[in-house]
């Protein structure tokens, strides 16, 4: 099983989806421009309602800026980065279609194509700020995909991340 993650702290903390890591005992982590494969043996923190988890590797990393905004804007251009079907760091683009409330979680609906393995990847604005964490896509719909909004990421991982306003 493969998935994606986002570095949120320079001490090696990585944000991903709980459904990516919840059945694992160890997690192999790759970084761009680094041939070494790192292993994480522990889920540091998780939230089952938000489908978020944090793991840690022993590597200094440059974190991605987390953008906290009032609301993502419909029609706003976005970029999705993940590892669909194991294809490392694949980039696709699209727009924000809507912001949806699903019980306890507010999700961003977006059109950038994703596939299995994209979960845990970054949904970025055009300035490289994290708008959300890619979480789901519907096979029956075309480019009908969801990401956990950055405001929930901030609440969940507040003591791990650097916030950009």
Feature map (PLM): residue ranges:
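C-terminal cap/linker of serine protease catalytic domains
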Residues: 62-63, 84, 130-165
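Catalytic nucleophile loop of clan PA
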Residues: 6-7, 96, 113-134
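A generic structural motif
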Residues: 11, 44-47, 58, 97-100, ...
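Short, compositionally biased
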Residues: 91-103, 146-149
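Conserved beta-strand residues within beta-sheet cores
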Residues: 2-4, 40, 93, 111, ...
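Conserved active-site neighborhood of the chymotrypsin/trypsin-like protease fold
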Residues: 2, 9-82, 86-89, 104-107, ...
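Short, Lys/Arg- and Gly-enriched loop/turn segments at beta-strand edges
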Residues: 86-94, 141-142
């Amino acid at each position: 099983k493969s998935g994606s993650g986002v570095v949120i702290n320079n001490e090696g903390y990585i944000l991903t989806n709980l459904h990516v890591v919840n059945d694992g005992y160890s997690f192999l982590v790759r970084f761009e421009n680094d041939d070494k494969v790192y292993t994480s043996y522990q889920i540091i923190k998780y939230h089952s309602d938000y489908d978020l988890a944090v793991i840690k590797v022993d590597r200094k990393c440059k974190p991605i800026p987390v953008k906290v905004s009032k609301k993502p804007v419909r029609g706003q251009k976005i970029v999705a980065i993940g590892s669909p079907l194991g294809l490392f760091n694949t980039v696709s683009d699209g727009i924000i279609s809507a912001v949806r409330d699903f019980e306890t979680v507010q999700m961003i609906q977006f059109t950038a194509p994703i596939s299995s393995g994209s979960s845990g990847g970054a949904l970025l604005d055009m300035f490289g700020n994290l708008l959300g964490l890619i979480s789901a896509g519907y096979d029956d719909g075309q480019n009908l995909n969801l990401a956990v909004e950055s405001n929930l990421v901030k609440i969940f991982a507040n003591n791990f991340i650097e916030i950009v306003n």
